[in-house]
């Protein structure tokens, strides 16, 4: 006796369906991971979304919650499992998993614990999606992007850190608020480390091509009477402030990751400040990952824009690199 399905559907194709072309995997279903996942879904950036985590109940719950809303989205398939086989054929893998810093813990110890976590994650990603691009979001992101590159064996252009894409967005928002314009109307970049030693490029800050440094040669310096430098300090402090108020940050980084995802899966060749291998650039001699203006396309980081920086800005960038290398050089088991 024929089933309802057999009566309803007459198959025409003899072969099974093609594998997904724009499959995105998010590793880690915490606050940041789910903000990334939802942002990617809302922008219709994948034809399949896979979620992976070690916490099976939370993972299944998040998967079901998203699946129940698929009617309202254009992505047809959301899957999840602790087994990385579910990630097979991913075009992009977003890594948000990692351990949190404990009170009084050194950054080196935090990174070393995350190295041990990543040693379980990265080889599994490569096993099932050898042609993927990896976007690292876990903090400290620049060092963990280096760790991912070393563990994955992928070429450097296919291992990217979310870097200062969010720092730059915060900078543009805060500067634009002070100027009374929309964030998209202010052009400004924050480079270097995602964190305390990030570098605001005051020499390039402009509105409609009008250089703010030409209007105020002291902008961003201690001698600036208008104290624009305080805006960058607010950028650096902003994550700490949000964490103090709500316990974590997730929405802005989720939007930022979706923005980067779009440039990669749609092959847009847009320029973003993301973490990439900077050895031999700006006089940096070590294998560190820092944020520079990168052209993101289907191959990952297609190229790096050779931004004109002042001597002071280059010195700050080198300081950023030294800070990161100070941690990286003592890492074990890489």
Curated annotation (Swiss-Prot):
It is found in: Cytoplasm. NAD(+) binds at residues 30-58, 100, 139. Substrate binds at residues 107, 139, 170, 249. Transmembrane segments: none annotated. GO terms for biological process: lactate metabolic process. Its EC number is 1.1.1.27. Keywords: Cytoplasm, NAD, Oxidoreductase. SUPFAM superfamilies: LDH C-terminal domain-like, NAD(P)-binding Rossmann-fold domains. Pathway: Fermentation; pyruvate fermentation to lactate; (S)-lactate from pyruvate: step 1/1. Homotetramer. This is L-lactate dehydrogenase B chain. It comes from Fundulus heteroclitus. The lineage of its organism: Eukaryota, Metazoa, Chordata, Craniata, Vertebrata.
């Amino acid at each position: 006796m024929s089933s309802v399905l057999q009566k309803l559907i007459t198959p025409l194709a003899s072969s099974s369906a093609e594998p997904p072309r724009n499959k995105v995997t998010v590793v880690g279903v915490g606050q940041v991971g789910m903000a990334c996942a939802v942002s990617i879904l809302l922008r219709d950036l994948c034809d399949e979304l896979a979620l992976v985590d070690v916490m099976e109940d939370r993972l299944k719950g998040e998967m079901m919650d998203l699946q129940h809303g698929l009617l309202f989205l254009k992505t047809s398939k959301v899957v999840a499992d602790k087994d990385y086989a579910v990630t097979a054929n991913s075009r992009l893998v977003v890594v948000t998993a990692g351990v949190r810093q404990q009170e009084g813990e050194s950054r080196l110890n935090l990174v070393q614990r995350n190295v041990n976590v990543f040693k379980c994650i990265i080889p599994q990603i490569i096993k099932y999606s050898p042609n993927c691009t990896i976007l690292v979001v876990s903090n400290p992101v620049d060092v963990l992007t280096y760790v991912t590159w070393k563990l994955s064996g992928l070429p450097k252009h296919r291992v990217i850190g979310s870097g200062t894409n969010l720092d730059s967005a915060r900078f543009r928002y805060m500067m634009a608020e002070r100027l009374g314009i929309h964030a998209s109307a202010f052009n400004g970049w924050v480079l270097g480390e995602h964190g305390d030693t990030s570098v605001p490029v005051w020499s390039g800050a402009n509105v409609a091509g009008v250089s703010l440094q030409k209007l105020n040669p002291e902008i961003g310096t201690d001698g600036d009477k208008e104290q624009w430098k305080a805006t960058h300090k607010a950028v650096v402090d902003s994550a700490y402030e949000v964490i103090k108020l709500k316990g974590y940050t997730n929405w802005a980084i989720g939007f930022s990751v979706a923005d980067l995802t779009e440039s990669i899966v749609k092959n847009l060749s847009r320029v973003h400040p993301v973490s990439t291998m900077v050895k031999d650039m700006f006089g940096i001699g070590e294998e560190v990952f820092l944020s520079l203006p990168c052209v993101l396309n289907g191959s990952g980081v297609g190229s790096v824009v050779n931004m004109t920086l002042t001597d002071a800005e280059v010195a700050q960038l080198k300081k950023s690199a030294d800070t990161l290398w100070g941690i990286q050089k003592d890492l074990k088991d890489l």
